[in-house]
Amino acid sequence: MNKTGFERGEVNGIRVHVMPTTRFKTFAVSLYMGTPLAEDTVTPTALIPFILRRGTAKYPETTQFREALENMYGAGFGFDVYKKGDYQMVQFRMDTINDSFVSADESLLKQSISFLGDAVTNPVLENNAFREKYVTAERENVRKRLESVVNDKIRYAAERCIQEMCKDEPYRLNALGQLSDLDGLNGANVYERYQQWLENSTMDLYVVGDTTLEEVLELVGSQFARKTNTQHAYKISIPRSAGAEVKRIVEKMEISQGKLNMGLRTPITYGDNRYASAWVANGILGGFPHSKLFTNVREKESLAYYVGSRFDPYKGITTIQSGIEIQNFDKALNIIQEQLANLQAGEISESEISQTKAMIRNDLLESRDSAYQMIGYDFNGRFADKDRPVEQLLSEVESVTPEQIQSAASVLTLDTIYFLTTEQKEA
Protein backbone atom coordinates (compact mmCIF):
# COMPACT_ATOMS: atom_id res chain seq x y z
CA MET A 1 0.00 0.00 0.00
CA ASN A 2 2.29 2.74 -1.29
CA LYS A 3 0.39 5.43 -3.13
CA THR A 4 2.11 8.51 -4.50
CA GLY A 5 -0.86 10.86 -4.31
CA PHE A 6 -3.34 12.06 -1.72
CA GLU A 7 -6.89 10.78 -1.44
CA ARG A 8 -9.38 13.44 -0.43
CA GLY A 9 -12.59 13.81 1.52
CA GLU A 10 -14.40 16.27 3.77
CA VAL A 11 -16.02 16.09 7.20
CA ASN A 12 -17.26 18.79 9.62
CA GLY A 13 -16.16 21.45 7.13
CA ILE A 14 -12.58 20.10 7.28
CA ARG A 15 -10.86 19.08 4.05
CA VAL A 16 -9.08 15.76 4.67
CA HIS A 17 -6.10 14.54 2.63
CA VAL A 18 -4.59 11.08 3.17
CA MET A 19 -1.60 9.37 1.56
CA PRO A 20 -1.81 5.65 2.43
CA THR A 21 1.77 4.33 2.53
CA THR A 22 4.00 1.93 4.46
CA ARG A 23 7.18 3.82 3.52
CA PHE A 24 7.45 5.59 6.86
CA LYS A 25 7.73 4.23 10.40
CA THR A 26 5.59 7.06 11.73
CA PHE A 27 2.28 8.76 11.05
CA ALA A 28 2.66 12.39 9.97
CA VAL A 29 -0.41 14.45 10.87
CA SER A 30 -0.63 18.10 9.89
CA LEU A 31 -3.52 20.53 10.36
CA TYR A 32 -3.57 23.86 8.51
CA MET A 33 -5.93 26.59 9.74
CA GLY A 34 -6.02 29.82 7.76
CA THR A 35 -7.86 33.13 8.18
CA PRO A 36 -7.40 36.45 6.34
CA LEU A 37 -4.72 38.70 7.81
CA ALA A 38 -6.38 41.66 9.53
CA GLU A 39 -5.05 44.33 11.87
CA ASP A 40 -7.67 43.78 14.57
CA THR A 41 -7.35 39.97 14.69
CA VAL A 42 -3.72 39.20 13.83
CA THR A 43 -2.38 39.46 17.41
CA PRO A 44 -5.05 37.47 19.30
CA THR A 45 -5.02 34.84 16.53
CA ALA A 46 -1.24 34.49 16.84
CA LEU A 47 -1.59 33.96 20.59
CA ILE A 48 -4.17 31.15 20.25
CA PRO A 49 -1.86 28.19 19.45
CA PHE A 50 0.54 29.21 22.23
CA ILE A 51 -2.37 28.96 24.68
CA LEU A 52 -3.75 25.75 23.18
CA ARG A 53 -0.44 23.95 23.76
CA ARG A 54 -0.71 24.61 27.51
CA GLY A 55 -3.62 22.30 28.20
CA THR A 56 -6.99 20.85 27.23
CA ALA A 57 -10.18 20.17 29.17
CA LYS A 58 -8.96 16.58 29.49
CA TYR A 59 -5.36 17.55 30.38
CA PRO A 60 -5.73 21.00 32.00
CA GLU A 61 -2.19 21.19 33.38
CA THR A 62 0.74 21.57 30.98
CA THR A 63 2.57 18.70 32.69
CA GLN A 64 -0.44 16.44 32.05
CA PHE A 65 -0.54 17.59 28.41
CA ARG A 66 3.11 16.63 27.95
CA GLU A 67 2.73 13.34 29.82
CA ALA A 68 -0.09 12.37 27.46
CA LEU A 69 2.30 12.80 24.54
CA GLU A 70 4.94 10.71 26.31
CA ASN A 71 2.36 7.98 26.86
CA MET A 72 1.85 7.84 23.09
CA TYR A 73 5.41 6.50 22.79
CA GLY A 74 6.87 10.00 22.75
CA ALA A 75 4.58 11.50 20.11
CA GLY A 76 5.60 14.92 18.85
CA PHE A 77 3.33 17.97 18.91
CA GLY A 78 4.22 21.38 17.52
CA PHE A 79 2.91 24.36 15.61
CA ASP A 80 3.95 27.27 13.41
CA VAL A 81 2.37 30.67 12.88
CA TYR A 82 3.20 32.30 9.55
CA LYS A 83 1.66 34.17 6.66
CA LYS A 84 0.92 32.76 3.24
CA GLY A 85 -0.13 35.47 0.84
CA ASP A 86 -2.72 37.61 2.63
CA TYR A 87 -3.61 34.82 5.07
CA GLN A 88 -2.47 34.14 8.62
CA MET A 89 -1.71 30.44 8.90
CA VAL A 90 -1.56 28.29 12.02
CA GLN A 91 -0.15 24.85 11.29
CA PHE A 92 -0.25 22.09 13.90
CA ARG A 93 1.89 18.95 13.50
CA MET A 94 1.85 15.60 15.22
CA ASP A 95 4.03 12.61 14.56
CA THR A 96 3.66 9.26 16.23
CA ILE A 97 5.06 5.82 15.63
CA ASN A 98 3.27 3.40 13.30
CA ASP A 99 1.07 0.95 15.22
CA SER A 100 2.80 -2.05 13.64
CA PHE A 101 6.03 -1.22 15.52
CA VAL A 102 4.51 -1.18 19.02
CA SER A 103 1.81 -2.99 20.96
CA ALA A 104 -0.48 -0.17 22.07
CA ASP A 105 -3.89 -0.86 23.61
CA GLU A 106 -5.48 1.64 21.21
CA SER A 107 -4.45 2.74 17.72
CA LEU A 108 -1.78 5.44 18.00
CA LEU A 109 -3.22 7.18 14.94
CA LYS A 110 -6.58 7.34 16.70
CA GLN A 111 -4.90 8.63 19.87
CA SER A 112 -3.00 11.26 17.86
CA ILE A 113 -6.03 12.58 15.99
CA SER A 114 -8.02 12.53 19.23
CA PHE A 115 -5.26 14.46 21.01
CA LEU A 116 -4.98 17.01 18.18
CA GLY A 117 -8.75 17.39 17.99
CA ASP A 118 -8.90 17.96 21.73
CA ALA A 119 -6.04 20.46 21.68
CA VAL A 120 -7.66 22.51 18.92
CA THR A 121 -11.36 22.28 19.78
CA ASN A 122 -11.56 21.54 23.52
CA PRO A 123 -9.17 23.84 25.42
CA VAL A 124 -9.03 24.26 29.17
CA LEU A 125 -11.30 27.12 30.28
CA GLU A 126 -12.04 29.07 33.47
CA ASN A 127 -15.25 31.10 33.73
CA ASN A 128 -15.89 30.61 30.01
CA ALA A 129 -12.54 32.15 29.10
CA PHE A 130 -8.99 30.95 28.53
CA ARG A 131 -7.06 30.31 31.75
CA GLU A 132 -5.58 33.67 32.64
CA LYS A 133 -2.19 32.40 33.82
CA TYR A 134 -1.66 30.70 30.45
CA VAL A 135 -2.64 33.84 28.55
CA THR A 136 -0.28 35.99 30.64
CA ALA A 137 2.68 33.64 30.19
CA GLU A 138 2.20 33.12 26.46
CA ARG A 139 1.56 36.82 25.86
CA GLU A 140 5.05 37.45 27.21
CA ASN A 141 6.42 34.66 25.05
CA VAL A 142 4.97 36.29 21.92
CA ARG A 143 6.21 39.69 23.11
CA LYS A 144 9.79 38.39 23.34
CA ARG A 145 9.55 36.91 19.86
CA LEU A 146 8.31 40.18 18.38
CA GLU A 147 10.94 42.19 20.25
CA SER A 148 13.67 39.85 19.02
CA VAL A 149 13.00 40.92 15.42
CA VAL A 150 14.61 44.32 15.97
CA ASN A 151 17.75 42.63 17.32
CA ASP A 152 18.07 40.53 14.16
CA LYS A 153 18.81 43.29 11.66
CA ILE A 154 18.48 40.98 8.63
CA ARG A 155 14.94 40.03 9.65
CA TYR A 156 14.15 43.57 10.73
CA ALA A 157 15.17 45.08 7.39
CA ALA A 158 13.23 42.42 5.48
CA GLU A 159 10.08 43.15 7.51
CA ARG A 160 10.44 46.91 7.26
CA CYS A 161 10.83 46.73 3.48
CA ILE A 162 7.58 44.75 3.23
CA GLN A 163 5.82 47.12 5.65
CA GLU A 164 6.73 50.11 3.50
CA MET A 165 5.99 48.33 0.24
CA CYS A 166 2.59 47.02 1.39
CA LYS A 167 1.56 49.93 3.62
CA ASP A 168 -2.17 49.58 2.93
CA GLU A 169 -2.22 45.78 2.44
CA PRO A 170 -2.73 43.02 5.04
CA TYR A 171 0.58 41.50 3.88
CA ARG A 172 2.43 44.23 5.81
CA LEU A 173 1.48 42.55 9.10
CA ASN A 174 3.79 40.24 11.03
CA ALA A 175 2.11 36.84 11.44
CA LEU A 176 2.83 37.01 15.21
CA GLY A 177 0.91 40.25 15.50
CA GLN A 178 1.69 43.71 16.85
CA LEU A 179 3.45 44.60 20.10
CA SER A 180 1.03 47.46 20.71
CA ASP A 181 -1.92 45.05 20.90
CA LEU A 182 -0.51 42.55 23.40
CA ASP A 183 -1.28 44.39 26.65
CA GLY A 184 -4.96 44.54 25.79
CA LEU A 185 -5.31 40.77 25.44
CA ASN A 186 -6.82 38.64 28.20
CA GLY A 187 -8.48 35.28 28.67
CA ALA A 188 -11.93 36.56 27.73
CA ASN A 189 -11.19 38.48 24.54
CA VAL A 190 -8.70 35.93 23.18
CA TYR A 191 -11.26 33.17 23.80
CA GLU A 192 -13.85 35.23 21.94
CA ARG A 193 -11.45 35.50 19.00
CA TYR A 194 -10.68 31.76 19.29
CA GLN A 195 -14.36 30.89 18.82
CA GLN A 196 -14.53 33.00 15.65
CA TRP A 197 -11.24 31.54 14.42
CA LEU A 198 -12.37 27.94 14.98
CA GLU A 199 -15.63 28.53 13.13
CA ASN A 200 -14.26 30.57 10.23
CA SER A 201 -10.85 29.04 9.52
CA THR A 202 -10.20 27.16 6.32
CA MET A 203 -9.09 23.78 7.68
CA ASP A 204 -7.03 21.13 5.90
CA LEU A 205 -5.99 17.99 7.77
CA TYR A 206 -3.29 15.74 6.29
CA VAL A 207 -2.21 12.23 7.26
CA VAL A 208 0.67 10.31 5.67
CA GLY A 209 1.12 6.72 6.86
CA ASP A 210 -0.26 3.21 7.02
CA THR A 211 -3.97 4.08 7.05
CA THR A 212 -6.91 4.77 4.74
CA LEU A 213 -8.99 7.80 3.86
CA GLU A 214 -12.07 6.11 5.30
CA GLU A 215 -10.39 5.50 8.66
CA VAL A 216 -9.13 9.09 8.92
CA LEU A 217 -12.49 10.60 7.92
CA GLU A 218 -14.20 8.60 10.66
CA LEU A 219 -11.61 9.67 13.25
CA VAL A 220 -11.73 13.35 12.28
CA GLY A 221 -15.53 13.33 12.24
CA SER A 222 -15.67 11.98 15.79
CA GLN A 223 -12.70 13.85 17.31
CA PHE A 224 -13.00 17.40 15.91
CA ALA A 225 -15.96 19.17 17.51
CA ARG A 226 -16.88 22.11 15.31
CA LYS A 227 -20.07 24.18 15.34
CA THR A 228 -20.08 24.56 11.57
CA ASN A 229 -19.97 22.25 8.58
CA THR A 230 -19.15 25.14 6.27
CA GLN A 231 -16.05 24.58 4.18
CA HIS A 232 -14.25 27.88 3.63
CA ALA A 233 -12.03 28.33 0.58
CA TYR A 234 -8.91 30.49 0.19
CA LYS A 235 -9.29 33.50 -2.07
CA ILE A 236 -6.00 34.59 -3.58
CA SER A 237 -5.82 38.33 -4.18
CA ILE A 238 -4.78 39.60 -7.60
CA PRO A 239 -1.18 40.88 -7.39
CA ARG A 240 -0.83 44.65 -7.33
CA SER A 241 1.23 46.58 -9.84
CA ALA A 242 4.22 48.60 -8.68
CA GLY A 243 3.64 52.29 -8.04
CA ALA A 244 4.38 54.89 -10.71
CA GLU A 245 7.40 55.98 -8.68
CA VAL A 246 9.81 53.78 -6.75
CA LYS A 247 9.45 54.26 -2.98
CA ARG A 248 12.79 55.11 -1.36
CA ILE A 249 13.00 54.59 2.39
CA VAL A 250 16.04 55.33 4.56
CA GLU A 251 16.02 54.33 8.22
CA LYS A 252 18.81 54.99 10.72
CA MET A 253 19.90 52.77 13.59
CA GLU A 254 23.05 52.06 15.55
CA ILE A 255 24.47 49.45 13.19
CA SER A 256 27.84 48.85 11.57
CA GLN A 257 26.60 47.10 8.44
CA GLY A 258 24.00 48.56 6.08
CA LYS A 259 21.00 46.53 4.96
CA LEU A 260 19.83 47.20 1.41
CA ASN A 261 16.50 45.56 0.62
CA MET A 262 14.38 45.89 -2.50
CA GLY A 263 10.78 44.91 -3.17
CA LEU A 264 9.53 44.06 -6.65
CA ARG A 265 6.05 43.25 -7.92
CA THR A 266 5.13 40.50 -10.38
CA PRO A 267 1.76 39.41 -11.78
CA ILE A 268 2.91 35.77 -11.65
CA THR A 269 1.62 33.62 -8.78
CA TYR A 270 1.50 29.89 -7.99
CA GLY A 271 -1.68 29.44 -10.02
CA ASP A 272 -0.16 31.04 -13.13
CA ASN A 273 1.06 28.87 -16.00
CA ARG A 274 4.30 30.87 -15.86
CA TYR A 275 5.01 29.86 -12.26
CA ALA A 276 7.84 27.41 -13.09
CA SER A 277 9.50 30.04 -15.30
CA ALA A 278 9.32 32.61 -12.49
CA TRP A 279 10.74 30.05 -10.03
CA VAL A 280 13.73 29.38 -12.28
CA ALA A 281 14.16 33.11 -13.00
CA ASN A 282 14.37 33.86 -9.27
CA GLY A 283 16.87 31.03 -8.82
CA ILE A 284 19.10 32.57 -11.49
CA LEU A 285 18.70 36.07 -10.04
CA GLY A 286 19.44 35.34 -6.39
CA GLY A 287 18.06 32.05 -5.14
CA PHE A 288 21.28 30.01 -5.05
CA PRO A 289 25.06 30.38 -4.54
CA HIS A 290 25.63 30.35 -8.33
CA SER A 291 23.09 33.14 -8.95
CA LYS A 292 23.81 36.46 -10.62
CA LEU A 293 23.52 38.45 -7.40
CA PHE A 294 25.81 36.17 -5.40
CA THR A 295 28.53 35.78 -8.05
CA ASN A 296 28.59 39.42 -9.15
CA VAL A 297 27.68 41.51 -6.09
CA ARG A 298 29.36 39.37 -3.44
CA GLU A 299 32.15 37.41 -5.13
CA LYS A 300 33.34 39.57 -8.04
CA GLU A 301 32.79 43.03 -6.55
CA SER A 302 33.02 42.10 -2.84
CA LEU A 303 30.21 44.55 -2.13
CA ALA A 304 27.97 42.40 0.05
CA TYR A 305 28.34 40.20 3.12
CA TYR A 306 25.24 38.39 1.94
CA VAL A 307 22.89 38.86 -0.99
CA GLY A 308 19.96 36.90 -2.37
CA SER A 309 16.39 37.04 -3.60
CA ARG A 310 13.15 35.39 -2.60
CA PHE A 311 9.97 34.90 -4.65
CA ASP A 312 6.62 34.72 -2.84
CA PRO A 313 4.27 33.08 -5.36
CA TYR A 314 1.22 33.52 -3.12
CA LYS A 315 1.51 37.30 -3.15
CA GLY A 316 3.30 38.17 -6.39
CA ILE A 317 6.30 39.76 -4.67
CA THR A 318 10.04 39.21 -5.09
CA THR A 319 12.41 40.65 -2.50
CA ILE A 320 16.17 41.21 -2.69
CA GLN A 321 18.15 41.31 0.56
CA SER A 322 21.77 42.34 1.03
CA GLY A 323 24.18 43.35 3.77
CA ILE A 324 26.70 45.99 2.64
CA GLU A 325 29.23 48.53 3.86
CA ILE A 326 27.28 51.74 4.31
CA GLN A 327 29.54 53.75 1.98
CA ASN A 328 28.94 51.22 -0.82
CA PHE A 329 25.20 51.90 -1.10
CA ASP A 330 25.21 53.52 -4.55
CA LYS A 331 27.59 51.02 -6.09
CA ALA A 332 25.78 48.01 -4.63
CA LEU A 333 22.38 49.33 -5.72
CA ASN A 334 23.64 49.90 -9.26
CA ILE A 335 25.15 46.43 -9.60
CA ILE A 336 22.06 44.74 -8.16
CA GLN A 337 19.88 46.61 -10.65
CA GLU A 338 22.33 45.73 -13.40
CA GLN A 339 21.95 42.00 -12.65
CA LEU A 340 18.17 42.31 -12.79
CA ALA A 341 18.39 44.22 -16.08
CA ASN A 342 20.69 41.56 -17.55
CA LEU A 343 18.24 38.83 -16.59
CA GLN A 344 15.37 40.78 -18.11
CA ALA A 345 17.40 41.31 -21.29
CA GLY A 346 17.89 37.56 -21.63
CA GLU A 347 21.59 37.55 -20.75
CA ILE A 348 21.41 34.08 -19.23
CA SER A 349 24.05 31.39 -19.64
CA GLU A 350 23.38 27.70 -20.19
CA SER A 351 25.31 27.05 -16.99
CA GLU A 352 23.04 29.35 -14.96
CA ILE A 353 19.96 27.58 -16.31
CA SER A 354 21.24 24.03 -15.84
CA GLN A 355 22.59 24.69 -12.33
CA THR A 356 19.35 26.35 -11.25
CA LYS A 357 17.20 23.55 -12.63
CA ALA A 358 19.46 21.00 -10.90
CA MET A 359 19.11 22.76 -7.52
CA ILE A 360 15.32 22.97 -7.82
CA ARG A 361 15.16 19.36 -9.00
CA ASN A 362 17.19 18.19 -5.99
CA ASP A 363 14.88 20.07 -3.62
CA LEU A 364 11.82 18.50 -5.22
CA LEU A 365 13.27 14.98 -5.23
CA GLU A 366 14.36 15.28 -1.59
CA SER A 367 10.81 16.25 -0.64
CA ARG A 368 9.70 12.72 -1.52
CA ASP A 369 11.70 11.44 1.45
CA SER A 370 9.87 13.67 3.94
CA ALA A 371 6.20 13.18 4.73
CA TYR A 372 5.89 16.78 5.93
CA GLN A 373 7.52 18.18 2.78
CA MET A 374 5.13 16.16 0.61
CA ILE A 375 2.28 17.53 2.70
CA GLY A 376 3.64 21.07 2.28
CA TYR A 377 3.88 20.83 -1.50
CA ASP A 378 0.37 19.43 -1.73
CA PHE A 379 -1.05 22.14 0.50
CA ASN A 380 0.49 24.79 -1.78
CA GLY A 381 -1.83 23.49 -4.48
CA ARG A 382 -4.86 23.46 -2.19
CA PHE A 383 -4.12 27.01 -1.06
CA ALA A 384 -3.70 28.35 -4.60
CA ASP A 385 -6.43 26.14 -6.09
CA LYS A 386 -3.88 24.83 -8.59
CA ASP A 387 -2.92 21.18 -8.34
CA ARG A 388 0.81 20.78 -8.97
CA PRO A 389 2.12 17.38 -7.81
CA VAL A 390 5.90 17.11 -7.40
CA GLU A 391 6.14 15.06 -10.62
CA GLN A 392 4.39 17.85 -12.53
CA LEU A 393 6.61 20.52 -10.97
CA LEU A 394 9.68 18.50 -11.99
CA SER A 395 8.42 18.33 -15.56
CA GLU A 396 7.45 22.01 -15.69
CA VAL A 397 10.83 23.18 -14.35
CA GLU A 398 12.76 20.89 -16.69
CA SER A 399 10.91 22.20 -19.76
CA VAL A 400 11.37 25.93 -19.02
CA THR A 401 13.13 27.67 -21.92
CA PRO A 402 15.53 30.67 -21.85
CA GLU A 403 12.82 32.75 -23.54
CA GLN A 404 10.29 31.84 -20.83
CA ILE A 405 12.79 32.74 -18.10
CA GLN A 406 13.40 36.12 -19.72
CA SER A 407 9.67 36.68 -20.12
CA ALA A 408 9.00 35.87 -16.45
CA ALA A 409 11.82 38.19 -15.36
CA SER A 410 10.66 41.00 -17.64
CA VAL A 411 7.41 41.48 -15.69
CA LEU A 412 9.29 42.15 -12.43
CA THR A 413 8.88 45.83 -11.53
CA LEU A 414 10.80 47.62 -8.79
CA ASP A 415 8.44 49.04 -6.16
CA THR A 416 10.49 49.85 -3.04
CA ILE A 417 14.13 50.46 -2.06
CA TYR A 418 14.74 50.25 1.69
CA PHE A 419 18.11 51.09 3.27
CA LEU A 420 18.92 50.60 6.95
CA THR A 421 21.95 52.74 7.78
CA THR A 422 23.69 54.84 10.44
CA GLU A 423 24.59 57.76 8.20
CA GLN A 424 22.50 60.59 6.78
CA LYS A 425 22.14 59.03 3.37
CA GLU A 426 19.67 59.81 0.60
CA ALA A 427 18.54 56.66 -1.21
List where the protein language model places each region:
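Active-site glycine-rich loop that binds ribose-phosphate moieties when present
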Residues: G184-Y191
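Short, polar/flexible loop-turn hinges at active-site or ligand-entry regions and domain interfaces
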Residues: G55-K58, S100-S103, N122-R131
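His/Glu-rich zincin catalytic helix
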Residues: M1-Y73, A104, Q178, Y191-N296, ...
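Short, flexible, solvent-exposed loop/turn segments with mixed acidic/basic and small polar residues
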Residues: Y82-K83, Y191-L198, S309-F311, Q406-S410
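Short, low-order "capping/linker" segments at domain edges
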Residues: K144-S148, E245-S256, R361-Y372
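Glycine-rich, mobile lid/loop segments that gate access to catalytic sites or pores
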Residues: V142, S148-V150, C161, M165
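M16 family metallopeptidases and their MPP-like homologs
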Residues: H17-M19, K25-A38, T43-P44, T62-D118, ...
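Acidic/histidine-enriched alpha-helical segments
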Residues: R66, N122-L146, Y234-A242, E338, ...
